[in-house]
C-alpha cells in the first residue's frame, strides 16, 4: 500500500510474482465490493521509465509511486491496483518492460501482459512519439505478446478489447493520423505473422481489437496543454454521455466486483503455474465458487430467521401471519442471492439458484407442514364442536357433509396461502388426510348420536314398560297379561315410529335396510327387557307376597273393600275355599304369558336371534315351569292355611258367650266398687283412656297383635325381675356361707348349704 490509511492503492502481484490475498479488503475499502458490473478495469503497459505511473496519477487521480527524475531506476515493481478518483474504475499499473533489473528475463513481461489482457477492458499502451516506428522502442515485442495472448484466450468468444495508444510528448510535427497509420501497419504485420487457430486464418486485428490513439504534449514544457489533453482524455473515461466514451459494453469481462478478487487470484495462479489459461472455464469456476459463497452468506440470516420463527410455534398451535412471514423470508433470501449472484455465469447462477430454492424449500416446508398439522387438529376440534349445534330439522349426514366441505376448503385455502414462488408444496395429502378423518369422525358421530337417541328412546320405553309391569303386579288379576301386553305393544309401536323418524337423520335417506335393522334390534331388545322385567317382578319372595295380598283381599275383604265379619264358621270355610281356588288359578295364569284366547303373543322377530335358551315362543313366554308352579302352590297354601286358622280362631273366640247370670252377679257384688271408681276422677279417667285404646285396637283389628306384644313385654319384665332377684339372693347366700365358714371352719358344709339353697331357689 502506498497510502495505508485509506488504502488508495495496493500491490496485487509483487516483484516475486506472489499474489496479494488482501485484495478483498482493498475492494471493500474503496467501496466497489458491491458494485456488481458497475465498474471498469484499465491496465497500462509500456517501457520502463516512460511515465506510466505519472500518466495514471494525472488521468485518474491515483497515487502510484513515480520515478525520481534524478534517478533513472525502476519504481513500479510487480502489478499495482488503485481506484480512480470519483469514478468506479480500477486502474492497474503494470511493471514496465525492457527494465535492466530483469534483463533478458521476459517471463514476468509475458505473464503480466497475459494477466492484464485477461482482466482489463482497456489496455493503455504508453509510448514516446520518437519511439513510433521502432520495433523495440515502440513496444512492438510487447504488443506481439498481447496479440498472441488475446488470440489464444478469446478466439472462441471473440471478446473485444481496446488498445488505447497514448503518444507522449506529442509535438504535432507529424500528424496523429500518420503516427496512427505507422502503428497500425506494425500491428497488422505482427498479426499476419501470428499462428492463428483453425478457422481464423483470414482474420484481421480489428476482429478482436479496437485501437485508439491519443497524443499528449510534454508534461513539463507544455504543462497547460498537457493538463488540457489529460482532462479531455479523462472525460472519455468517466463521462458515459461523451460521444468518444471509451468503455464499450463489449469490453466488460462480466466479472462482478465481489468476485474480482477471486477471479484475478485464480487467473494469476493459472498463469504462474504455466497452465493453459481457459478464461471461460475460469469464469465458470468463479461463478460456481462465488455462488456457493453467496448461498452460504444469505443462508446465515435465513437460518437465524428460521430459528426465531420456530420459537413462535407452540406445540399444536397455529402461527399467526405465517404466510406473510414465510414469503418475506423466502423473498429476502432469494433477492439477496439474486442481487449478488445474477452477475455471474447465467447457467451457473440459475443452477445454484435452484439449489438454494431447494434448500430454502426444505427449511420452510417444516413450517408449512407444522402449520397444516396444527390446522388439522383445530379443524377436527371445530367439527366436533359444530356437530353439537347442527340444526335439528336437517339430517345429520347433510349438515356433516356441508361442514366437512367447509373445513376442507379452509385447509386448501391455508395451504395455497402458504405457497411460495417457484416452490410447489402439495397440499393434497393434507386435504386427503383431513377429509378421511373428518368423514370417519362424521360416521362415528352419526353412530354415537344415533345411539344416544336410540338409548334415550329405549330408556323412555323401559320406564313406561317398567311402570306398567309394576302397577299390574301390584294388583294382580286373571287378565293381567292382556293388560300388560296391550300397554307393552302400544309403547313398542310408538317407539318404532319414533325410530323410523330418527334413523334417516343419521343415515342415508334411501338406506331403508339400516332402518329396518335398528327396528328389528329394538324389537329384540324390547321383548328381552319385557321378559327380564317380568322375571324380576315374579321372583319367589315377591310372588309369594303378592299372592298372599291377592288371597287376603279375596278372603278378608268383600267386593266393596270392607273387612268381613264372620259370625258362623261355615261362612269362613266357604270364603276360604273360594279364595284359595282363585289364587291357585292365578298361579297357573301367571305361569305363561298368554292372551285371553290362550295363545302366545306374536313376537314379530326370529326367536332364535333372542337368546340361546329360547328355542320356541313357548320357552320364551313360559315364566314358571311345572315344578315351580307346584312349589309356589304348596308354599302359598301353607301361608293361606295360617291365615285361615287365625281367622277361624278369632271367630270361635267371638262366638263363645258368657252366661247372662254372670253379669247380674257382677253388678250386685261389684256395685260398691263401681261407684268408688265413678266417684274417683283420676281412676275414672284412666279407665276411660284404657277403654278407648282397647276399642280402637278392636276396631282396627289390632287387638290380637297388641295382646301378643303385651304378653311378650310382661314375660320380659318377669324374666328380668327374676334374674335380678336370683343374683341378689345368690350373693346373700355366699356371704352367709362365708360367715359360717369363719365360725365353724367347715367349708364343705357351707358349700353344701349354699348349693341346697340355690337348688331350692330354682
Swiss-Prot record:
GO biological process, one term: endoplasmic reticulum organization
Main function: Cooperates with the reticulon proteins and tubule-shaping DP1 family proteins to generate and maintain the structure of the tubular endoplasmic reticulum network. Has GTPase activity, which is required for its function in ER organization.
Domain (GB1/RHD3-type G): residue spans on this chain: 36-251
Record text on subunit structure and interactions: Interacts with sad1.
Segments crossing the lipid bilayer: 658-678, 682-702
Subcellular location: Endoplasmic reticulum membrane
Gene name linked to the record: sey1
InterPro entries named in the record: G_GB1_RHD3_dom, P-loop_NTPase, RHD3/Sey1, Sey1/RHD3-like_3HB
Keywords in alphabetical order: Endoplasmic reticulum, GTP-binding, Hydrolase, Membrane, Nucleotide-binding, Phosphoprotein, Transmembrane, Transmembrane helix
Key word Zinc-finger present: no
Lumenal side stretches: 679-681
Record membrane topology: Multi-pass membrane protein
Disordered: annotated span: 736-762
Protein name listed in UniProt: Protein sey1
Family recorded in the similarity comment: Belongs to the TRAFAC class dynamin-like GTPase superfamily. GB1/RHD3 GTPase family. RHD3 subfamily.
Listed HAMAP family: Sey1
CDD domains in UniProt: GBP
Molecular functions (GO terms): GTP binding; GTPase activity
Chain positions recorded as GTP binding sites: 46-53
UniProt entry tagged with the keyword Transmembrane helix: yes
Enzyme Commission code: 3.6.5.-
